[in-house]
């Protein structure tokens, strides 16, 4: 597991010369939640108009996170897993080993994206990734995320500051689902959760991460120099 201090020391990208890639991908392994959150915020605060966007692929040790709309009563019982109150949208969720997390540090204006469009893009990337494994997944009206036969397999939550996003999405690969029984996932009582392993998929988190990354890269609009697509 990468130490929090190492992650927090990731340097913000300085203004970049022409030809710099529009997207930097960091594969971070299993990293503690709070240092990762602080590093995302620091990156977002320090970035300039020329800083390349980044996607961080990783896992977290067991942790519950409670978004800005979260209500503490959705933590049904104390099972010894830390609870962290954070600044993303949404309610309570669980992260743990075996769950793929992708954080999207994106300049929305530069790619001509609105917040709702980025949310839809993330959902579609998960749907496309699962389709590549032969699993049919879908959205659910009024309940952000990705579902298979009504059970949640992918969660998402964002924070946007000055037109720049951080946080992102989580996809259950072979994560232990037991901790979800101690919460109302995303604020929904009795919501079932599933993982890719339940459908006979043996790929590990790193392998699934590469498939998800391909889907995200395919769906993300290019960086437009003027900050918006040409008319």
Swiss-Prot record:
The active site is at 186 (acyl-thioester intermediate). The record marks 152 as: Lowers pKa of active site Cys. Substrate binds at residues 88-95, 155-157, 168-170. It is found in: Cytoplasm. Pathway: Protein modification; protein lipoylation via endogenous pathway; protein N(6)-(lipoyl)lysine from octanoyl-[acyl-carrier-protein]: step 1/2. Its EC number is 2.3.1.181. It catalyses: octanoyl-[ACP] + L-lysyl-[protein] = N(6)-octanoyl-L-lysyl-[protein] + holo-[ACP] + H(+). Residues 49-224 form the BPL/LPL catalytic domain. Keywords: Acyltransferase, Cytoplasm, Transferase. GO terms for biological process: protein modification process. InterPro entries: aa-tRNA-synth_II/BPL/LPL (IPR045864), BPL_LPL_catalytic (IPR004143), Octanoyltransferase (IPR000544), Octanoyltransferase_CS (IPR020605). GO terms for cellular component: cytoplasm. Pfam families: LplA-B_cat (PF21948). One of its GO terms (molecular function) is lipoyl(octanoyl) transferase activity. Catalyzes the transfer of endogenously produced octanoic acid from octanoyl-acyl-carrier-protein onto the lipoyl domains of lipoate-dependent enzymes. Lipoyl-ACP can also act as a substrate although octanoyl-ACP is likely to be the physiological substrate. Belongs to the LipB family. In the reaction, the free carboxyl group of octanoic acid is attached via an amide linkage to the epsilon-amino group of a specific lysine residue of lipoyl domains of lipoate-dependent enzymes. This is Octanoyltransferase. The gene is lipB.
């Amino acid at each position: 597991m990468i130490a929090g201090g190492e992650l927090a020391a990731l340097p913000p990208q300085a203004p970049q010369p022409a030809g710099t890639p529009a997207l930097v991908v960091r594969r971070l392994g299993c990293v503690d939640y709070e240092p990762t959150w602080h590093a995302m915020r620091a990156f977002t605060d320090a970035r300039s108009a020329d800083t390349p966007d980044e996607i961080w692929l990783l896992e977290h040790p067991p942790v519950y996170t409670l978004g800005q709309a979260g209500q503490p009563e959705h933590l049904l019982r104390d099972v010894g897993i830390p609870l962290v109150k954070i600044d993303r949208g949404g309610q309570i969720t669980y992260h743990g080993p075996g769950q793929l997390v992708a954080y999207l540090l994106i300049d929305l204006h530069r790619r001509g994206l609105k917040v709702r469009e980025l949310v839809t893009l993330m959902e579609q990337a998960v749907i496309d990734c699962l389709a590549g494994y032969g699993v049919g997944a879908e959205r659910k009206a009024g309940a952000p995320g990705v579902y298979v036969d009504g059970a949640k397999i992918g969660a998402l939550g964002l924070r946007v500051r000055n037109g720049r996003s951080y946080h992102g999405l989580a996809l259950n690969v072979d994560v232990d689902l037991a901790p979800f029984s101690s919460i109302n996932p995303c604020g929904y009582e009795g919501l079932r959760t599933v993982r890719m392993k339940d459908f006979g998929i043996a790929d590990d988190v790193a392998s699934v991460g590469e498939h998800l990354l391909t889907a995200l890269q395919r769906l993300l609009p290019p960086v437009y120099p003027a900050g918006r697509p040409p008319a």
